[in-house]
C-alpha cells in the first residue's frame, strides 16, 4: 500500500529498504531514515520495528531508534522495541530459497528476540538463530558479504597474475579444488547491490572507530578494477589478431538469470572497450530495455545478426547463453573471430579451427 494510514497501529513493522553508497562509496542511509519517518508517523505503543536492510553495526539502535522516537514521540525500549533480522536471499537461486536459509534474529530484549524467532520460524523451514544482540546480527550480515567479496578479489588477483603467465585461471582452480579445504570461488565481475556495496559499510564503521580496514578496501579495489582489466585484455587479444570489431556483449545484468541491472560491472567492460575505439552491441533478454537506457544509456539489441561480430563476449551466464552450442556462437561471428568468456561458461566447448579464444 501507499497509504500510510492503512498501516497504523500494527504490532510488528518490517523495514527492508535499499542501503546503497554514494559516489564516494560512503553509506547512504537516506532510504532507512525515510522508512523510519514513515513508520514513526504511525507507530503505536508496544510495537516492534524490525530492520532487515544490510547496515553497519549500530545503525538500528543508534540511528533508527532515535529517528523513530523523534517522529513518534514514543520512548524506544519502553513504548516500542527494535529488532534486526538480516535479509538472506540469493536472487536467481532456486535451491537456496528464503525458506531454506536459517534466519538470524535479534531483539532489543530477549523477549523481543524470541517473539521475532517465533514469527519468522512460522515461515522459515530451516529454522532461526537468535544472535547475542542487535549489533552482533548487523555485523554478521555485513561480514557475510564482505567475506565473499574478499575471496572473489583473491581469485581475481591470481587470475590477473595467471593471465600474464599464460595460464588459465579456471584450469588452475579446477586442480586446486581437488584439495578438500580449498575454497571454490571463481574470478569475475563483482556487481549488484550487496557484495559490491556492503563491504563499504563495514569499512566506514571501522574508520569511525579508528581502524584502517586494509584487506576489505584492497578487495574492493581489485574487484572494482576488473571491468577495465577484462576490457583491456580482450581489446589486446583482438588487436593482436587483427580484429577491429564490432563486439557483441551477451549479458548486462549483475548476475545470471536475474533481470536486475543495479550496479552491474558489465558496464565497465563496455566502457573500456569503447575507450579502445571498439563498437559494442549489448544483448540481454532478461534485462528491461528501458532500464538499460535510463541507467546506462545503452540501447539493448533485441535480435542478433549472424556473421556480424569480430568478437563475442559471454559476460553473464544466463541459461540462454550458457547452453549455446559452438555452432550458434560461431554463426554470430566473422571468420576467425574472438570468443571471449568472462565466466568460463564455454571453456569446455570445442570451436572450429581458426577462431581465437580468451577467458578470464
Kindly label every feature range from the protein language model.
Residues 1-360:
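Structural/interface elements that position substrates and couple domains in central-metabolism enzymes
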Amino acid at each position: 500500500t501507499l497509504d500510510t494510514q492503512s498501516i497504523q497501529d500494527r504490532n510488528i513493522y518490517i523495514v527492508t529498504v535499499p542501503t546503497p553508497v554514494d559516489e564516494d562509496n560512503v553509506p547512504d542511509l537516506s532510504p532507512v531514515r525515510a522508512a523510519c519517518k514513515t513508520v514513526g508517523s504511525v507507530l503505536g505503543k508496544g510495537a516492534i520495528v524490525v530492520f532487515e536492510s544490510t547496515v553497519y553495526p549500530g545503525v538500528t539502535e543508534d540511528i533508527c531508534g532515535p529517528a523513530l522516537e523523534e517522529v513518534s514521540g514514543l520512548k524506544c525500549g519502553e513504548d516500542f522495541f527494535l529488532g534486526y533480522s538480516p535479509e538472506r536471499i540469493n536472487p536467481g537461486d532456486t535451491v537456496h530459497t528464503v525458506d531454506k536459509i536459517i534466519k538470524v534474529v535479534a531483539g532489543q530484549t530477549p523477549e523481543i528476540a524470541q517473539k521475532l524467532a517465533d514469527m519468522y520460524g512460522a515461515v522459515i523451514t530451516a529454522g532461526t538463530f537468535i544472535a547475542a544482540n542487535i549489533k552482533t546480527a548487523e555485523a554478521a550480515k555485513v561480514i557475510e558479504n564482505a567475506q565473499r567479496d574478499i575471496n572473489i578479489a583473491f581469485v581475481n588477483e591470481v587470475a590477473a597474475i595467471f593471465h600474464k603467465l599464460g595460464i588459465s585461471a579456471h584450469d588452475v582452480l579446477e586442480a586446486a579444488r581437488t584439495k578438500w579445504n580449498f575454497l571454490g570461488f571463481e574470478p569475475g565481475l563483482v556487481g549488484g547491490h550487496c557484495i559490491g556495496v556492503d563491504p563499504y559499510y563495514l569499512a566506514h564503521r571501522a574508520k569511525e572507530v579508528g581502524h584502517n580496514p586494509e584487506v576489505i578496501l584492497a578487495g574492493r579495489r581489485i574487484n572494482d578494477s576488473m571491468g577495465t582489466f577484462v576490457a583491456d585484455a580482450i581489446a589486446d587479444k583482438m588487436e593482436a589478431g587483427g580484429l577491429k570489431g564490432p563486439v557483441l556483449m551477451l549479458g548486462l545484468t549483475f548476475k545470471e538469470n536475474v533481470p536486475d541491472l543495479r550496479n552491474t560491472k558489465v558496464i565497465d567492460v563496455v566502457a573500456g572497450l569503447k575507450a579502445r575505439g571498439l563498437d559494442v552491441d549489448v544483448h540481454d533478454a532478461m534485462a528491461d530495455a528501458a532500464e538499460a537506457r535510463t541507467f546506462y544509456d545503452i540501447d539493448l539489441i533485441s535480435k542478433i545478426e549472424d556473421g556480424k561480430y569480430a568478437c563475442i563476449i559471454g559476460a553473464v551466464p544466463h541459461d540462454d547463453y550458457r547452453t549455446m552450442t559452438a555452432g550458434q556462437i560461431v554463426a554470430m561471428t566473422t571468420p576467425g573471430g574472438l570468443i571471449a568468456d568472462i565466466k568460463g561458461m564455454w571453456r569446455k566447448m570445442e570451436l572450429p579451427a581458426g577462431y581465437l579464444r580468451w577467458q578470464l
